[in-house]
């Protein structure tokens, strides 16, 4: 073989292994065939090319031009577009032309977190036994054929640009098997109400703490205050700050989204965190919104499920109250504008299973929050009864709730469970609970002068207290120490 042939073969091999060497215009992985573009927002289209190369983007009657800068980076912005189920092609041209096919315009959401968000549709389809929530009439893994729901699964090691422009898929068949069940059912519920294309992006890692999802520099912010004492910096206990942010969130920026869904916390609860988690959570919400240049971007999350942390084999000691304290920390995020939370204390068959199976109901409940708060369907009730205030009257406590919907109720028709009260001795005992309108009257013959209340204040919480829409009441304690300082 002569030298010339060796050179040709070497170049051919390089171009086959690294197609970007031959393609002057390169797109990020998130831009590809089958994608959904966010409606009614400016849509950035970006990538790299040779410095100074002229780039043209044509889509939906729009024609945009720009030039790659000295670093080879370029970006154009498409004008806001109405939703469209009409599949269209986008042409990106420099010295080469890339044609992205089958593109829709609609609503796009990013869902993230740990294993309960990552929990795949293939696991969901194997569920047997007692049904909780509004179970689908069929196995979506076998029957899903709605071409207007698209999915993109962020894989940790496969977000580099490539020449296939794959990644986005119609939510059906093989592509749907590995996708987040919560994300899919959320998107399905949105489509059934909005009747426009839905794009769901899933970026989740089993067992992950919250720190890897936050840009490392953001966790180096000023220490927070707790009862007048300085907390250590939020990154003091390590937790691999920024690890998954760098590989699974940053590559998505600035792909336009409507909002975020978050289902995470078990790994931080194992650390017995409470207020520290609340500050980390706030940092994550604010930093992601800042990344997408929208300080009011919707952020909806799941209050994690009951689980027996105190009976687990973890090396740290836990009490049955560690989880309620974590729930309390999660709920503090509701003080941040444009956030929403769902409670799932009723979706657990066993507190030794950290992965409760009813993901279709988790997705549905998250969709209720979005439909009410983002899409302004104000007739949709999106939360269970939520503590508002209490008044002490003689030897009873009168508790007022918000999110009562069409009225307060008991899931099984029996007296309400889960309430405890205490007097000055702080010894909590089970309380008798009587519903009156949007209030609950609590009392106990063992507490003559009640002062404080707790509801579902245990890791095994499973109260029958709901509103008429079937949504469970949110755990709380009336003496929450954090609400005045967070």
Which residue ranges define each predicted feature?
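Bacterial Sec-dependent N-terminal signal peptides
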Residues: 1-24
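Cell-envelope and extracellular/periplasmic
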Residues: 23-486
């Amino acid at each position: 073989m002569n030298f010339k042939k060796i050179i040709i073969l070497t170049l051919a091999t390089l171009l086959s292994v690294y197609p970007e060497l031959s393609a002057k215009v390169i797109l990020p992985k998130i831009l590809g065939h089958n994608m959904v573009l966010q409606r009614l927002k400016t849509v950035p289209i970006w990538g790299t090319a040779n410095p100074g190369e002229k780039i043209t983007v044509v889509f939906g009657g729009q024609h945009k031009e720009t030039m790659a800068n000295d670093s080879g980076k370029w970006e154009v912005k498409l004008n806001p577009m109405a939703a469209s189920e009409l599949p269209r092609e986008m042409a990106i041209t420099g010295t080469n032309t890339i044609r992205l096919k089958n593109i829709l315009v609609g609503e796009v959401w990013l869902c993230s977190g740990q294993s309960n968000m990552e929990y795949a549709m293939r696991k969901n389809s194997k569920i047997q036994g007692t049904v909780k929530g509004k179970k689908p009439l069929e196995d979506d893994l076998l029957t899903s054929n709605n071409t207007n729901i698209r999915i993109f699964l962020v894989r940790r090691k496969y977000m580099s640009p490539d020449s296939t422009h794959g990644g986005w898929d119609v939510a059906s068949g093989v592509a749907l098997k590995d996708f987040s069940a919560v994300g899919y059912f959320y998107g399905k519920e949105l489509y059934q109400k909005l009747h426009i294309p839905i794009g769901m992006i899933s970026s989740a890692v089993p067992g992950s703490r919250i720190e890897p999802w936050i840009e490392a520099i953001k966790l180096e912010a000023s220490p927070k205050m707790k009862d007048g004492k300085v907390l250590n910096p939020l990154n003091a206990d390590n937790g691999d700050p920024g690890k998954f942010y760098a590989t699974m969130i940053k590559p998505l920026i600035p792909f336009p989204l409507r909002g975020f869904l978050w289902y995470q916390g078990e790994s931080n609860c194992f650390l017995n965190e409470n207020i520290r988690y609340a500050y980390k959570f706030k940092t994550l919400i604010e930093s992601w919104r800042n990344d997408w240049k929208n300080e009011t971007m919707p952020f909806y999350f799941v209050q994690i499920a009951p689980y027996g942390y105190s009976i687990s084999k973890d090396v740290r000691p836990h009490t049955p109250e560690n989880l309620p304290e974590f729930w309390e920390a999660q709920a503090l995020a509701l003080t941040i504008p444009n956030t929403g939370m769902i409670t799932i204390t009723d979706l657990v068959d066993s507190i030794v299973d950290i992965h409760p199976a009813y993901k279709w109901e988790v997705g549905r409940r998250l969709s209720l929050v979005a439909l009410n708060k983002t899409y302004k369907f104000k007739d949709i009730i999106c939360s269970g009864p939520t503590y508002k205030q209490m008044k002490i009257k003689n030897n009873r406590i009168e508790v007022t709730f918000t999110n009562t919907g069409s009225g307060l109720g008991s899931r099984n028709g029996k007296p309400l469970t889960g309430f405890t009260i205490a007097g000055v001795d702080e010894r909590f005992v089970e309380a008798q609970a009587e519903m009156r309108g949007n209030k609950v009257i609590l009392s106990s013959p063992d507490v003559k002068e009640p002062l404080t209340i707790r509801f579902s204040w245990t890791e095994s919480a499973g109260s029958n207290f709901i509103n008429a829409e079937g949504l469970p009441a949110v755990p709380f304690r009336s003496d929450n120490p954090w609400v005045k300082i967070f």
